[in-house]
C-alpha cells in the first residue's frame, strides 16, 4: 500500500498549525497571568 505523502503532510499541517497556535496563545496568557 503506497502512502500518499501529500495527504500525510496536509493532515500533519492541519493538526499541527492549530495546535501550535493554541499553545502559543496559552503560553502568552500564562505569562501575562504570572505578571
Curated annotation (Swiss-Prot):
GO terms for biological process: photosynthesis, light reaction. Keywords: Chloroplast, Membrane, Photosynthesis, Photosystem II, Plastid, Reaction center, Thylakoid, Transmembrane, Transmembrane helix. It comes from Adiantum capillus-veneris (Maidenhair fern). Belongs to the PsbM family. SUPFAM superfamilies: Photosystem II reaction center protein M, PsbM. HAMAP family: PSII_PsbM (MF_00438). It is found in: Plastid, Chloroplast thylakoid membrane. The keyword Transmembrane helix applies. This is Photosystem II reaction center protein M. One of its GO terms (cellular component) is photosystem II. It is a single-pass membrane protein. PSII is composed of 1 copy each of membrane proteins PsbA, PsbB, PsbC, PsbD, PsbE, PsbF, PsbH, PsbI, PsbJ, PsbK, PsbL, PsbM, PsbT, PsbX, PsbY, PsbZ, Psb30/Ycf12, at least 3 peripheral proteins of the oxygen-evolving complex and a large number of cofactors. It forms dimeric complexes. The chain crosses the membrane at residues 5-25. One of the components of the core complex of photosystem II (PSII). PSII is a light-driven water:plastoquinone oxidoreductase that uses light energy to abstract electrons from H(2)O, generating O(2) and a proton gradient subsequently used for ATP formation. It consists of a core antenna complex that captures photons, and an electron transfer chain that converts photonic excitation into a charge separation. This subunit is found at the monomer-monomer interface. NCBIfam families: PS_II_psbM.
Amino acid at each position: 500500500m503506497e502512502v500518499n505523502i501529500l495527504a500525510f503532510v496536509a493532515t500533519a499541517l492541519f493538526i499541527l498549525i492549530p495546535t501550535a497556535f493554541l499553545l502559543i496563545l496559552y503560553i502568552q496568557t500564562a505569562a501575562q497571568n504570572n505578571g
